[in-house]
Regions:
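Gly-rich Lys/Arg/Thr-decorated short loops/hinges at beta-loop-alpha junctions or inter-strand turns
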Residues: 1-5, 112-115
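Long, hydrophobic N-terminal alpha-helical segment
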Residues: 2-54, 59
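Structural motif
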Residues: 5-9, 31-34, 59-61, 79-83, ...
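Short basic, glycine-rich beta-strand/loop surfaces that mediate nucleic-acid
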Residues: 10, 49-61, 70-84, 117-124
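Generic hydrophobic/aromatic pocket-lining and core-packing "Φ" positions
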Residues: 21-22, 91, 132
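Short gly/pro/ser/thr-enriched loop/turn and capping motifs at secondary-structure boundaries
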Residues: 41-43, 68-69, 90, 111-114
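Ordered, amphipathic secondary-structure segments that act as subunit-interaction surfaces
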Residues: 61-107
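Glycine-rich, aromatic-bearing surface loops/beta-hairpins
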Residues: 97, 102-159
Length: 159
């Protein structure tokens, strides 16, 4: 069985937001945006706004972490996949579940209680840092990059 064509995995807790997904889709050439989040997958009322925001001609799917692990290897060769997750923990669960992720771009992680800002768009807590460190130990390439044409911030800001 061929490996699924995962072009990029992106951590962005807004998922499909404004022009961001359009720019990222253009940059990597995906034709399927896979939103992987247990909460969103369980609530189809949240899907419509994201589907409307997706670029024309790009499919969107909403799966839980476990469903993604279970079916990612059934992707066809013509599916060029951009995976969107909300957190490093979800990305780590995918990798540990056998999803062949090689690179993760961190774009937006909301500030909040017990979260410290590391860039204007990324705030982390201790669990995020631990998950990112583990991903790095597993050989996953990590970068902080807001938009495809922006310069990446060093991952050392986080880990």
């Amino acid at each position: 069985m061929a490996q699924p064509k995962i072009l990029l995995t992106r951590i962005d807790d807004r998922f499909i937001y404004g022009q961001d997904v359009e720019l990222w889709n253009e940059a990597v050439g995906s034709n399927l945006v896979l939103i992987v989040n247990d909460e969103i997958a369980a609530d189809s009322r949240k899907w419509a706004p994201m589907r409307v925001s997706a670029p024309e001609g790009v499919w969107t799917r909403f799966f839980s972490v476990q469903r993604t692990v279970d079916i990612i290897h059934t992707a066809t060769p013509r599916q060029l996949i951009l995976i969107m997750v909300a957190s490093p923990a979800d990305a780590l669960a995918l990798v540990k579940g056998g999803v062949p992720i090689t690179k993760i771009s961190i774009g937006h992680m909301r500030a909040g209680e017990d979260r410290r800002p590391v860039t204007p768009a990324v705030a982390v807590d201790d669990a995020d840092v631990a998950a990112l460190r583990e991903l790095q130990k597993l050989g996953i390439e990590l970068e902080i990059r807001y938009l495809p044409n922006s310069n990446p911030d060093p991952i050392q800001l986080v880990i």
